[in-house]
Amino acid sequence: MPFRTPNSELRMKMFIPRLFIALCYRAVYKLHHALCLRPGAPLEHSKLIVVGSFRTGGAGKTPFCIWLCKHLAAQGNTVALLAHEYAFDEIKMLRQKFAGNESVQVFATRNRYRLAHELDRSQKFDCIVCDDGFEDSRLVGATTILLQWEDLPTKIPELWPCGGMRSLAKDHHLDHGKRSPMVRILRCEGGNPAVRFVIDKVLHFYSGKEFVKNSAKVNIVCGLGNPERFCSDLQDFGIEIGHKFFFKDHSKAFTAQFEKIIQNRPQETFVISEKDAARLPAEFIQKNEKSQIFVASQTTEISTEVAQNLF
């Protein structure tokens, strides 16, 4: 028999129940799509664009949607950007980003398919962009932009909670050469990626002054889908990290917990993301105006060639 260490036995004990949950998740996923997400009717007027990823979170869909909507608007298009209302923090950030931009409107919805058809019938928008509608198989006729960080998932152990994937390649006709010509797969890592997400500035939340690199270590307070990638991007920017405080994506406890952290570390410096900054209420902002809080802004870099061949 092969030798097993205590750690390997522990990992196996943890893996088996997770695999069982992944199998149950897979069954529910297939049933939900068969009963509730049957392919619907295509739009008649607007161009439908879906931005998605296999990852459960942290793939960069929202930053990419910001770039995409600006790109489409710069070409003279009117754009509707649809986001799930559950992601309240992302919606706040998106509305801040596009405040004053008459070419782009942000909509919060529980049903992208229904709202897309309502907007299509209004004939007010040239393009309708869905932030994370990859799993909604009702959205027929869409151009899908898939942000890919790993190889396409093909096995059950890659699904949540064993892995970080929501579905398999075969669920979207992406395996074994069945890829639709209406799917654009953009790699986000590795050599010469099609898309890069880069932190280009870190500014004081209140004064707007730039963060001075090579100063004291900072604490990261983060409620993103992939907080470790956020930390890695900050290190690439030149920031030395002290403590890390991570919260679930879209956590409604973020503000209260962040305030406790500041109270316990009043003289220390903190860096948060734009999305986390957008969710902070006015009371928090007024109360902590003397705190050393910096906001990291991220830019999406896409080559001219890739941008020209998206559609």
Identify the meaning behind each predicted range:
Residues 33-87:
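Walker A (P-loop) phosphate-binding motif
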Residues 76-78, 124-125, 141, 215, ...:
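Short, high-confidence coil segments that cap the C-terminus of an alpha-helix
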Residues 86-194, 203:
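Phosphate/Mg2+-binding loops and adjacent switch elements
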